[in-house]
Each structure stands twice: as structure tokens, then as C-alpha cells.
Amino acid sequence: MRVCLLNDSFPPIIDGVANVVMNYARIMTENLGDQVIVGTPRYPDVDYTGYPYEVVAYSSVDTTDLVKGYRTGNPLSVSGVSRLSDFKPEIIHTHCPASSTIMARVLQKELDVPIVFTYHTKFDVDIARAVGEGFLKKETIKAMVSNISACDDVWVVSKGAGENLRSLGYEGEYRVVSNGVDFQKGKTSDALVKETTAGFDLPEGVPVFLFVGRIMKYKGIPLIIDALKELSDKDIKYRMVFVGGGADAEEMQEKVREYGISDNVIFTGPIHERDKLRAWNTRADLFLFPSVYDTNGIVVREAAACGLASVLIKDSCAAEGITHDRNGFIIEEDPHSMAALLEEASKDLSHLAQVGQNAMDEIYISWDESVRDARNRYDEILKMFRDGTLPRKKWSGTELLLDSASKIISGTGEIFNTSRSIQEGMRENFAEFKDEVREVRDGLYDVRDGIHDGLHDVKSEIRDGLQEIREKIDEFIDRGQE
């Protein structure tokens, strides 16, 4: 099968969804014999060759200061759409409701193939973080839900993710398709554990608690640190290891210093080597993941792969499938609840090991198994699409452009309202940036010119909307040349 995978993040940006796309592409190419192409926004000076599948990096705009670390892709990129179309995929799987799904719908219009969409994360939280609360957030969410509703098969990574999608206004059907992990089942070698943890103060017999992920407050890091202070106040021995980086790392390190618990807390910084991450999961006695933001909690299953049980928040998505004191631990969302559990758990490390073994046996799922299940669903979708039993979604070029492109691009990048101070910082790269923005403008012309004869009755204000967007882009280009 010829498969097109689309996502708004890909190396050099490594996040949970980028990891999903890479595993899908690798396993389908190497293990299942499929032909795969990946479309993603381009980052400057990045080599996209060397993968066992083709990566089409299309033009993007630098919004890294506005949307921490991420660029905003141009879903109307002529060269990007053209190359993906030339690949002639039989199915398109998009993993982000923003630029990727706009591009998927453009491709579908040309190729007449089904679109699968996976809802990975709570985008209302991401949008609010990028643009704040208010009208822009509301309109961006509305556009994204419209985008998702236009897809032929909607997947969510957990039951809780589906409930969150419903809360945003999505009314269609969806199915739960779980992600896997690329950790081999089982603990890593003692030698690798010793090598990886060398130089860190980890006394034998003292419980080691572990967190792996972005050091962001919404991940529940403050709750962990508050709980650790309670343990220290009671003179309970422990070591806490935070693996990862993030925008809130300095603030959290300062919080640890203010509490006077620095001797017990280790911040390793980001670790990208998978074998070293396995080693930390093997060395630890308990994984702490008090996040109510994450919809799947892949790190919880990575810990389980190494026989490490997790502490999770009651009713969170990450806690789905967890039975308290059987294959994990469930607490209320407050530091006192976590501190009480850690105090009790520290008394019997052998019991923690048994719960970790149960987690390995009961909640572990490999990426190979997960992708094979997804691939089987592709076959079902394609068959229904071709024999007419899968209802076709109505496509509207004007809706696609105005309700999706302009709102989503504005919502995630605020391209047209970029402040002059930010423009000044980009001035040295403006020649390249100007060409990319002009490509967005040219894409608007292409869509306008491609409106079919059957749309003659579209109201004049729709065309006025197109003209207004073009004028804003022209104004932006002119300001950058001043």
C-alpha cells in the first residue's frame, strides 16, 4: 500500500507525535513492505534524507518564539502538495488538525483517497498556551474541529482523548487506537545501568523515583516537588530523577532549591538515546507521572516495558487500564496524596518490583503490534471507500480556505499580526521568509482560481475575505522591506 503520513512535527523536533509518525513510517516500510511518504514543515539547515522512506519538507514560517520551538507549515505549499500528489498515495493519515489536515484535504480533493486522522493531544490546551483565551482560541478550535470532521476515519489514542475531542464540539464517530512503545520488553543489563547512572548519587537501598518528559508545569512537576518536600520534612530518604528539558526547567530547579531538597533531586537534562532511557527506567523503583494533560502517556508504557510501575492521577487518560496496587498506583491530584503513597511505597521496594512486573505483563504494547493493527484498519477503510460503503464527506474549497487555513494559521502562528519587534529580529532572514509568505499568498490565488463552476453562487463576501487575507500578507511583506 502507498501511504502518506502528515504531521506538524518531525525531527529536529522530537515530541510524542513525531515519535508516532516515525514508528508508523519505519515499521510499515521495513516490516510490512509498504511504500511511505511523510510530509512535514521544513526547518532550516536540516537534512531530511537518510530515512528508509521519503520525507517531503514543505515551506514553513518561523513561529518558534510564539509556539515554543515549533514552526508553522504552509499547507498551500505548491511544491509540497505537488510532490505528495505525485507519490499517488492510496490513503492519507494525518496526525495534527492544523496545517497537516488542511494539506490532507487539499490532497484528497485531487486524488480522491480516504483520510485518517488521529487525535493525540488536548489541542485546546495547546491553543490556549499559544494564543490565550478568548475569540481567537474559540475560532481556531472551531476550524480544527471542522477539519477533523471532514476526515473519513477518526482515531483517538485513549478513551479520555475521545472525551476531550467531544468537549471541543466534535460530533462524529471515533475509535480508540492505542500507540505502542519502541522499548524492548524487559529490563536492560546491569552493566548499561551502571554506565548510564555513573556519577549520580544513588545510594543502594534508597528508593529512586523517576520522571521522563518535558519539564513543563502542566505535566504535574510542581505537584511532584511539593510531595518531595513533604518527604524531606519527615526525613524520609529518596532520590528523585527528572529526565528531560523544557521551558519551565529553570523555574522548577529554583523551586527545588527554595525547598532545600537539592541533595535529593537530580535534573539530568534531555536524554535522547533510547538505551540510556531504558537504563534509567530499569534503575528506578517508581515512575511518577501526575499529568492530566497527556492523552496517552507513552512514557508510562515505556516504564512498564522495563518492569517499572507508575503513579498516576485518578481518572486521567494515562491511568486508563491501571488497577491500583496491581499494575500501578492511583492518587488524587494533590501533593499530599502523592507524598502519602511515596512514603508507604518506600517501605517495601520488593512490592514495587512486583507491581512493576504486573505492569510489564498487562499494559505493555509494542509499536510493531500497534502499527500492524492500524495497517489492518487501513485495509478496511480502503475497501469501504472503494465500494462506496464509507460515506463521502462533503468538500468545500471556500470552507477549507477561510474556516481552516486563515484561522488555524492565525491561531497557531499569528503570522499576520506579528509585532514589529519580532519582525526586526527576523530581518536578516527576511529574503527567505518573504518568499515563503508569498507562497502562502500565491496559494490563496490558486485556490480562488480553482473554485469550480458549481460554486458561482458563493456570496461575494467570501471572495472579499480572500482579498483581505492577501492584502494583509502584502502589507506584512511591505513592512518587512522597510
Predicted segments with their positions:
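A short, well-ordered alpha-helix in the C-terminal region of glycosyltransferases
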Residues: 351-365, 369
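Nucleotide-activated donor-binding/catalytic signature segment of Leloir-type glycosyltransferases, i.e.
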Residues: 253-271
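Short hydrophobic beta-strand element within catalytic cores of glycosyltransferases
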Residues: 309-313
